[in-house]
Curated annotation (Swiss-Prot):
Subunit structure: Monomer.
A family per Pfam: LolA
Keyword hit for Methyltransferase: no
Family (UniProt): Belongs to the LolA family.
Keyword flag Chaperone: yes
Protein name: Outer-membrane lipoprotein carrier protein
Amino acid sequence: MHRQLRYAVLATALFASTAFAGARQELDTFTRGLKGLDGQFSQRVTDANGRVKENSSGRVALATPRQFRWEYAKPYKQLIVADGKKVWVFDPDLEQVTVRAQGSEEQNSPLVALIDPTRLDKQYDVSEEAAPRDGLQWLSLTPKVDTDASFQMASLGFGKDGLAKMEVVDAVGQRTAISFSGWKRNPAFAADTFRYTPGKGVDVVGDAQ
């Protein structure tokens, strides 16, 4: 997958379905009192025909209200940091960082349901999957018409340890499947976790001020 596409990739009603209620209860339990998360991820991207485009893995960290860190370790390194005001995308092998203002794309990420569950019904139509899949309870999220989202549909899969998987399908049918592990709740983040400072010799593209 092209590097620029990586980034395009971070309920109030009562429902009758037992499976859906279980998934919502899992979400509510997982997010109750949540201020930050730190864990590992593995990611697979496939095209509309199911062909694998990329496998990758690394570390993810999230913190309220609008901070995140995606640190790809394999197959090559890339760092994406959102500090609440700006988003930095650093490619070490290119010695280049791209920076831009943090906007609606981050706020409309399906992961926003973890650190700000109140947005769930405001931004998505939430539906149930017919039955558990991969041993998980799933919530399907479809962006509402007036939501500026970069995907067509997302699914969150919950197990006994909370969020275990996330699947995202974009406008051209490309599917991104992410598995999470080793979640640490409300960790004591290092001061620079959600901060990026360009190193010596790094080209800065965009407005870093």
